[in-house]
């Protein structure tokens, strides 16, 4: 019988290479956060550090939520969480590289004034990559999964005896989708680590590294 609740020893996608990489990055991220968090206590913080104190924990929490949903086989739910997860990581990068964006964040990040996820991605592409990486349609898939348009069906369909069906519970037979979610999550969690490290002047912690 399929377990009602999976544990790390019997989860359905255990052993997937990208899932293992995601796990290792999460451990490194939590280790770095344990170093940076105390630095935010007591001292006067910069505007960037105040933004990081909000955005970094939210990004990590969403990463852990995505990981747990994968463990329990709720892949569509994990996919839907990708947009708020990515948006926080992108916002953190955006306010780090854009002083006007940081000021707008400190003023409350008014939805009528703040840039969209797509516009932030376009700005970062120009700023960091000199426009070399096409970003057109960057937010399209994230929006599709979030808002439930017909295109979103691709992440919630499996084949049963050759017939496409839309599961309402655990999806235990889509390793490709599990890989896709991990592949999307890894670079953005890594970027959040980089921004956290930069905001608090810490070296990033990687697998096998030593901390003080």
Where are these predicted regions, by residue range?
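Short runs of predominantly hydrophobic/aromatic residues within well-ordered alpha helices
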Residues: 52, 78, 82, 135-138
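Long, charged low-complexity segments
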Residues: 1-43, 104-212
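Residue-level recognition of alpha-helical structural elements
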Residues: 48, 71-78, 131, 178
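"Short basic amphipathic alpha-helical interaction patches in structured regions
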Residues: 81-83, 99-108
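Short, hydrophobic, well-ordered secondary-structure elements
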Residues: 56-97
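Short, contiguous, well-structured surface segments enriched in hydrophobic/aromatic residues
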Residues: 30-69, 110
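Short amphipathic alpha-helical interaction/hinge segments
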Residues: 93, 97-100, 150-153
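Short, charged N-terminal helix-start/capping segments
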Residues: 1-17, 51-73
């Amino acid at each position: 019988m399929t377990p009602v609740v999976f544990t790390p020893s019997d989860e359905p996608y255990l052993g997937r290479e990208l899932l293992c990489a995601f796990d290792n990055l999460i451990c490194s991220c939590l280790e770095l956060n344990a170093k940076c968090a105390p630095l935010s206590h007591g001292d006067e913080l910069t505007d960037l550090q105040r933004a990081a104190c909000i955005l970094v924990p939210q990004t990590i929490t969403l990463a852990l939520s995505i990981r747990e949903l994968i463990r329990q086989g709720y892949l569509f739910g994990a996919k839907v969480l990708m947009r708020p997860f990515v948006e926080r990581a992108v916002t953190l990068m955006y306010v780090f590289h854009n002083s006007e964006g940081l000021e707008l964040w400190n003023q409350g990040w008014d939805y009528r004034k703040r840039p969209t996820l797509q516009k932030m991605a376009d700005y970062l592409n120009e700023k960091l990559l000199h426009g070399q990486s096409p970003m057109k349609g960057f937010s399209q898939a994230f929006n599709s999964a979030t808002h439930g348009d017909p295109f979103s069906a691709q992440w919630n369909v499996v084949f049963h005896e050759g017939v496409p069906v839309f599961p309402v519970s655990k999806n235990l037979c889509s390793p490709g989708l599990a890989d896709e979610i991990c592949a999307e999550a890894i670079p953005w969690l890594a970027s959040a680590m980089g921004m956290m490290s930069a905001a608090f002047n810490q070296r990033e912690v990687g697998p096998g590294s030593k901390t003080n």
